[in-house]
């Protein structure tokens, strides 16, 4: 109970200024229809992260496309600022994968955004059947490849 109260007090402004922030604010999917997780500090520092904000909800194809569009807009807006960064081994600042396992479809997208000072930022989403999870991350993780290793 105390942890729930603490998590509820965490600020939600880390992803402010991004188009996807509309989702985290409950303007696209009502907050009561989402499972939201906010983690900050020591609990995730061993993963080289300082901020983790995720929302999970049921999403049809149209909603997935709408959210993907917002995330891509954020990525494109930041891609100019990424020229100083080292791309992954394939030369990309984003990654995607589509899998089918046990009759379930799984689609994942990961995007590197321009850093805020020395803090690196990432936007990721995963769709498993009709459930979508969107995650905003901040920390010292240096690349998408390193981030993928953390989430293995």
Predicted ranges, named:
Residues 1-20:
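Bacterial Sec-dependent N-terminal signal peptides
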Residues 94-120:
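Acidic, glycine-rich flexible loop segments
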Residues 140-152:
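Short, low-complexity, Pro/Ser/Thr/Gly-rich segments in the mature regions of secreted, periplasmic
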Residues 56-102:
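Mid-chain, structured segments of secreted extracytoplasmic proteins
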Residues 18-74:
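Early exported N-terminus immediately downstream of N-terminal targeting peptides
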Residues 110-142:
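A short, solvent-exposed beta-edge/loop patch
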């Amino acid at each position: 109970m105390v942890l729930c109260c603490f998590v509820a007090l965490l600020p939600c402004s880390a992803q402010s200024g991004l188009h996807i922030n509309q989702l985290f604010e409950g303007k696209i999917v009502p907050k009561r229809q989402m499972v939201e997780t906010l983690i900050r500090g020591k609990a995730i520092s061993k993963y080289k992260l300082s901020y983790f904000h995720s929302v999970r909800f049921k999403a049809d194809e149209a909603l997935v496309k709408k959210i993907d569009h917002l995330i891509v807009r954020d990525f494109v807006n930041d891609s100019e600022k990424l020229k100083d960064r080292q791309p992954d081994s394939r030369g990309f600042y984003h990654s995607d994968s589509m899998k089918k396992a046990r009759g379930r479809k799984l689609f994942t997208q990961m995007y590197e955004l321009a850093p805020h000072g020395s803090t690196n930022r990432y936007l990721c989403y995963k769709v498993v059947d009709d459930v979508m999870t969107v995650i905003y991350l901040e920390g010292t993780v240096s690349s998408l490849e390193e981030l993928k290793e953390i989430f293995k």
